[in-house]
Swiss-Prot record:
Enzyme class, first EC level, given as a word: transferase
Binding-site list for S-adenosyl-L-methionine: 226-227, 258, 280-282, 359
Cofactor note: Binds 1 [4Fe-4S] cluster. The cluster is coordinated with 3 cysteines and an exchangeable S-adenosyl-L-methionine.
Upper taxonomic lineage: Bacteria, Pseudomonadati, Pseudomonadota, Alphaproteobacteria, Sphingomonadales
Protein name from the UniProt record: Dual-specificity RNA methyltransferase RlmN
Domain of life: Bacteria
């Protein structure tokens, strides 16, 4: 890169490399009241904060254990609800700390039951999360960044600029909010008002079925806004809390992290997080993948597939998922399908392929492949002995489907969203 430009043309943003895997143009703005949000912090750090605030080491460790339990097992958002902590201690905690959640700006429900939330950070940046209910599972699609830097051509999020990384608290806070909305904390831990604010029609008759034993939220996919491996430390720390047996206690086998191919971070992902891996492949030739997934210009298909072959823990029991969006006349021919099979076999990958019908958005430069073309592609892969299900689009009517996140916040002005949020709060009393 030149040290100085002598003309007014703006140079394109370079694709970040392994030297700086977290390209962040903006830092998190501290809370105005100076209090520290405990959500997203491990027990050890909570104990250290309590000690710094004046508790002796033994008391700090005990209080941290108690608070951690109330945060992640009970889902409370108020220190006064922590009944095994002395009443005199609760105001002391409330003066210094806060139990945060991302602010809910808007909640939408699709005709197919998919739910999408437009959320806002404490420093006023918007992002989205999606809950997808199925007959045998409920999957939460979690965001890792506000915006994205990868510029994948078929993805609406890719047209956004990257604002900043989400913190561990903002990432795990999405899971907490979903549990609020689904009533998945032990009965009585939170009231129905929280669920109503989160966009769920909740009444006393529902309370018996919406419990943690009901497991409405069973799976997490890091497939929302952003590239998780460009926010590796924060994603890792958040998922450790989600998987902690004393935390949210979700098995790593029920968590999938999706990457567009940040090769230098993939091994660390397997070693330090250990969750299932999904790779946004989307093309099998250099020219096409260079166009639609520009990070391919830095980490090519062969390098990416070798990293998949080396991924810790990958096996026939824990296959790597390749995501493949079906784009008309771009990556959907029978020859493309046969090349996909060849590559998977060449690298001896324990893999399955999710074929994703392209979900349109305003101004998108591509169209979805026809149903017959998708079927032909899928049959070639399936007949080679590789699972190749065609994903049923979910939440298209509320722009919550794969590749559509961004639209809700673009359609409405910030002022209109603020007005709607105020009206909702006023209606709740």
């Amino acid at each position: 890169m030149r040290a100085m430009q002598t003309h007014t043309e703006i140079a394109p943003m370079p694709i970040p490399g392994h030297v700086d895997p977290v390209p962040v143009p903006r830092e998190v703005t501290p809370r105005e009241d100076g209090r520290i949000d405990l959500i997203g912090l491990p027990r050890k750090q909570i104990a250290e904060l309590f000690a710094q605030a004046g508790l002796d080491a033994k008391a700090a460790k005990l209080r941290a254990k108690q608070v951690f339990h109330w945060l992640y097992h009970r889902g409370v958002t108020d220190f006064d609800a922590m009944t095994d902590i002395a009443k005199t201690m609760r105001p002391w905690l409330a003066e210094r700390f806060v139990i945060g959640r991302p602010e809910i700006v808007e909640a939408q429900v699709s005709t197919d039951g998919t739910r999408k939330w437009l959320l806002r950070t404490a420093d006023k940046h918007d992002f989205e999360m999606v809950f997808i209910p199925d007959a045998d599972r409920g999957t939460l699609c979690v965001s890792s960044q506000v915006g994205c830097t990868l510029n994948c051509r078929f993805c609406h999020t890719g047209t956004m600029r990257l604002v900043r990384n989400l913190t561990p608290g903002e990432i795990v806070g999405q899971v907490m909010l979903a549990r609020d909305a689904l009533g998945e904390w032990p009965k009585g831990a939170n009231d129905s008002r929280v669920a109503t604010m989160a966009g769920l029609d909740f009444d006393d008759e529902d309370e018996g079925s919406y419990t943690s034993d009901g497991r409405l939220l069973t799976n997490i996919v890091m497939m929302g806004m952003g590239e998780p491996l460009y926010n590796f430390d924060n994603v890792r720390d958040a998922l450790k809390l989600v998987m902690d047996g004393d935390g949210l206690a979700l098995s790593k086998r029920r968590i999938t992290l999706s990457t567009s191919g940040v090769v230098p971070m993939m091994e660390r992902c397997g070693e330090e997080i250990g969750v299932n891996l999904a790779v946004s492949l989307h093309a099998v030739t250099k020219d096409v993948r260079d166009e639609i997934v520009p990070i391919n210009r830095k980490y090519g298909i062969e390098e990416l597939l070798q990293a998949c072959a080396d991924y810790p823990g990958a096996s026939n029991a824990r296959r790597i998922t390749f995501e493949y969006v079906m784009l008309k006349d771009k990556n959907d021919s029978d020859d493309h399908a046969r090349e996909l099979v060849r590559l998977i076999r060449q690298y001896k990958l324990p893999a399955k392929v999710n074929l994703i019908p392209f979900n349109p958005w305003p101004g998108a430069p591509y169209e979805c492949s026809s149903p017959d073309r998708i079927k032909s592609f899928a049959n070639i892969v399936f007949e080679a002995g590789i699972s190749a299900p065609v994903r049923t689009p979910r939440g298209r009517d509320i722009d919550a489907a794969c590749g559509q996140l961004k639209t809700a916040s673009e359609r409405k002005s910030r002022a209109e969203l603020d007005r709607l949020a105020e009206e909702k709060l006023a209606a709740l009393g």
